[in-house]
Amino acid sequence: MNALEQARFNMVEQQIRPWQVLDPAVLHTLQHIARELFVPAAYQALAYTDTEIPLGHGQTMVAPRIDARLMHDVALKPTDKVLEIGTGSAYLTALLADRSHHVVSLEINPELHANARKNLQRAGINNVDLRLEDGSAGAADISALLMPLC
């Protein structure tokens, strides 16, 4: 196990499980989606720490335990279509995509949108429709609505 894999393992064991996120499918997703691919270069060393990470434009990545709890609570099924409002770095988008059929993610900021697209491509995630769009307009044909408020 390399250092990043060990950090990911430690994140799950020391941050996620204590928050009573115990669903094996969610834990598997958190274990195999490389969070470091979604963290700005200046903050790579913090990818698996229990802290918010600045993305610029007043936005942050929430601590991993928050994403984990959201994933646990929405209890996605493989057939679900998800609308996410506020793509940010696309880490949560990647988690959602791993647990659902398709994700539509709306981001209003052009720079965050472009970075999110690159991040998802690097991670090999292709069941996401990223849109540069104001989320207040909404979208149809969605099984679950997740609006990160953190």
Name each region found by the language model.
Residues 1-42:
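N-terminal auxiliary segments of SAM/dcSAM-dependent transferases
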Residues 5-7, 50, 71, 94-98:
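A short alpha-helix capping/helix-coil boundary motif
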Residues 13, 47-50, 61-80:
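Conserved alpha-helix/loop element of class I SAM-dependent methyltransferases that forms part
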Residues 23-24, 64, 110:
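Alpha-helix N-capping/helix-start residues
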Residues 42-55:
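Short, surface-exposed glycine/acidic/tryptophan-bearing loops
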Residues 56-64, 86:
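Short gly/ser-rich anion-binding loops that grip negatively charged ligand groups
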Residues 75-150:
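Conserved nucleotide-cofactor-binding alpha/beta core module
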